[in-house]
Swiss-Prot record:
ATP binds at G18, P19, S20, G21, A22, G23, K24, G25. It comes from Clostridium perfringens (strain 13 / Type A). GO terms for molecular function: ATP binding; guanylate kinase activity. This is Guanylate kinase. Keywords: ATP-binding, Cytoplasm, Kinase, Nucleotide-binding, Transferase.
């Protein structure tokens, strides 16, 4: 049997961020439902499981000692402490999925994404934008869970966050979830065809073996 010129591609790490109300979660859910080769990265945390949460499904639940040990072993793409509990993205589990050819979505805040970018240089960083700030405002208001004070805080935060869009590889305007999903699918397809990704998967072949494969 003739050898393949290249191996099956390694999966792509897709890091998705954007302001609250931009529709990140809805887009990620649609991608997961539509594609069986796209998986969500499961975060690790030291907080106690809530009712109905399953270890390895909702989170990887760790003790603080276990979490700190993994920090020492450099096994997090990013991590942070929030209200006394640690949260992080396990590097080993993400790498395992990528090596298996799975595409991995990491939906994360901007600060976390920038930390991931320092370690995962081959990641694809996508910023989700609302069609307009007025539309973003209406989406947040429709949730019905915000006070006037918290609304103002969210709007100010959104303005600040949008300024980070230049740190990302791609920007996708979410005026329609279906269209936004199609744009991300196109980005993923293009990324898989990048020469630098293919080069990493090329088999080491002697010149005469390559000649035989191409011209026999």
């Amino acid at each position: 049997m003739m050898n393949k010129i290249h191996k099956d591609n390694r999966g792509v790490l897709i890091v998705i961020s954007g302001p609250s109300g931009a529709g990140k979660g809805t887009i990620c859910k649609a991608l997961l439902e539509k594609h069986d080769d796209i998986f969500i990265s499961i975060s690790a945390t030291t907080r106690n499981p809530r009712v109905g949460e399953v270890d390895g499904v909702n989170y990887h639940f760790l003790t603080k000692e276990e979490f700190k040990q993994r920090i020492a072993e450099d096994d997090f793409l990013e991590h942070a402490e929030v209200y006394g509990n640690y949260y992080g993205t396990p590097k080993s589990s993400v790498e395992k999925m990528l090596d298996e050819g799975k595409n991995v979505i990491l939906e994360i805040d901007i600060q976390g994404a920038l930390k991931v970018k320092e370690k995962a240089t081959d990641g694809v960083f996508i910023f989700i934008l609302p069609p307009s700030m007025e539309e973003l405002k209406q989406r947040i208001i429709k949730r019905g869970s915000e006070t006037p004070e918290s609304l103002m805080t969210r709007f100010k935060s959104a303005y600040k966050e949008i300024n980070y869009v230049s740190k990302y590889n791609y920007a996708v305007v979410n005026d329609n979830v279906e269209d936004a999903v199609k744009k991300i699918e196109a980005i993923l397809l293009a990324e898989k065809c990048r020469v630098d990704r293919l080069k990493e998967n090329l088999l080491e072949s002697k010149e005469d073996e390559m000649h035989e494969q191409l011209y026999d």
